[in-house]
Each structure stands twice: as C-alpha cells, then as structure tokens.
Amino acid sequence: MSNSPKSLVLISGYYGFGNLGDEAILESIIRELEKSVAKDKIVVLSNAPETHREIYGVEAVSRWKAASLLKLLPKAKLFISGGGGLFQDTKSPGSTIYYGGQIALARAFGAHPIIFAQGLGPLDSETGKVATRLAAKLSQDITVRDKASLAMLENWKIKAELTADPVWTLDETALPEGVGRQIDKLRNGNRLIVGLSLRNSHNFSEGRRAILLSVLLKTLPKDAALVLLPLQKEQDLPQLEPFLEAWKQAGRQGMVLDTKDLKRPSQWVSLMRHLDLVVAMRLHALIFALKEGIPVLGLTYDAKVEHVLRQFGQPILILPKEGGDDQLEQKWLDSASAGLQDLEKLGAQARENAESAKKLACRNFQLLAKILDIKN
C-alpha cells in the first residue's frame, strides 16, 4: 500500500442487521480485499461495528454516525457501495437517499465510489428513481448482478458491467462440530435431508405456506427430514416455526437449526454439504446450495430468485403477486413432481453453472484490484 494520505477502503451496505446474505457479501469483499489491502485500512460502515471488528479483524464504525463517515472520507481512496439490493424503495425511498447520499459525499471528498455487484430496484417512487440515477451518475464504476439492473442503467445512458453476486466466490470455512451433529442426528440410512429457507414476504401468506406444506408432503419421501434454516431470524422464524409444527403433526421429522455457533457466512457454505436438497425463498440460501452442487427447489418471492433458478435449470414454484391461488397447489405440485425426479441431474447442472457464475463474480474483484492499483 502507498503512504498516500488517501489509503482507506470504505465498505457500505446492509451490514450488521443479521441478514446472512448481506453478511456473506461482506465476508467475500473483505476476504478479497485482504489480498492487497492491510486490515487496518479496511473500514466497514456497520450496524454492529464491534461484531465485525471481532470476526474479521478489520476496522468498523457505526453506519448511523455521520461524523464518523465525514472523518474517514478525506482518507478514503475507494468507497464500495454494495453488494445486494441497496437501491430499492419497497418500503420508502429512504434507502436510495441514504446510500445515494454516501456516494455523493465520497465523490465530493475525492474517493473513488463504486456501485458493487448490486441488483437495482424495484423503484416505484419518483424520489427513488431520481436518487438512484444520481448515485449511478456519480459512481465512477458500476457492476450489477442481473440483466434488469443493466437494462435500467443502459436506459439512463449510464455505463455498467454485468457480473454476478460476489458470494459465488466465497470459499467455505470449517463447520463447528456441534452444527454438523445436529443434522447428522436426523440421518437414518438413505433418508433425504432437506434444508428449508422461508421468510416473511407480502406474497407469502399463511395460505400459501399451507399449500407449500401440502406439496412437500406429497412430493418428498415419507422418511425425508427437514432442517429449517433461519438466515435472518426475525423474518424467517415466524414462517419456519409454524411450518415445522404442521410438518411434525403430519408425522414427519425435522428441526430448526441452532445457528448460534455459526459466526461466519462461509460456515453456512460448508453446512450445505450436509443436505441433499434445499427448498428456499432466500436468494443466498439458493446460492450457498448451488455453489456446492446441491439441488434446489425455489420459491420466487422476488425476481432475483427466479433469475438464478432459471439460469441454473432448477425447479421453480412461482409466487404470484396477489390472488390466483385457486390452481396454485396443482401448479406447484406439477413443478415439484417433475423437477425433483432426478436430483443427481439437478446437482450436476448446479455444479456446471456454478463455475461460470464464479468466473463472472470474479470480475467484481478484478475491477477492485485494478482501481486500487491505479490509486496506489
């Protein structure tokens, strides 16, 4: 690293909120940056700075203290915004204003801002669209993880590169023994062990959860055991716990995974190797499984999920936005029955596509290395 006063790399995103997908993105960024940047020069803007300092040994400050950011920016050479879906206004345009404002400040202080491996949208408000467009114009480089985001930027005449989610590059770390033992207790001969990832969503009602239960009871072997995966506890457990109760009432076996010993997202990658199939709504549950060659059955609560499932040729349960539940069980039953007939084939397709996704994801880090080299 240079002795230039501008030596810091700032990383901003939805970090420190207990969302495993965002934490996996952060871990992948830190692990790549460590190859060329000293740990004390990497700073995470976090909702839980002490946690990130302890786990990764990097610097971290509260994302809510503007004074901390303003103190760091004069020393920052690179400002990474992402990845994930930061520029969206599903609840309010506040997120677009917050992250866009950071990019504007970074540019004003002479740092090199990059929108990194993001999925842009949905953007329904005029404020959200304006804030996102301005942030994109002020960013010196942009990589996006899906074609819809690229098309949006092209429509705005803003240059960007299509890459892939950085988590495709995240190598596994050792799984704590206690976590592996939890799953191994469910094993009995050739019994199928199925991971299940659900989350609260406007288009996943109690009725649709009941339909999913019915479909899995009909399509999975009678001795199949469920391992319920809370990737973000407050959003996931309200769906997972009643599902497990109903599953057990039907005479089936399963458990909610105790995740307290899982400190790093990369340990979840190792966890996937203990499963034979993953049924998931969450994007990163699907990515963790697919990158390890584990077949998946996905529920498309969001367009980004459908994009990955189609890319990897995995069976899809379409979640309509609203209404249309009359034929939903039959549609899901048809999709699951056809899709799950050959798990070995699905696993082979996963492995084949994961390699190309990893290569595409590496483009994000090649760009970072190039920027850092120029800035040195």
What would you call each of these model-derived segments?
Residues 1-376:
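Active-site anion-handling motifs in enzyme catalytic cores
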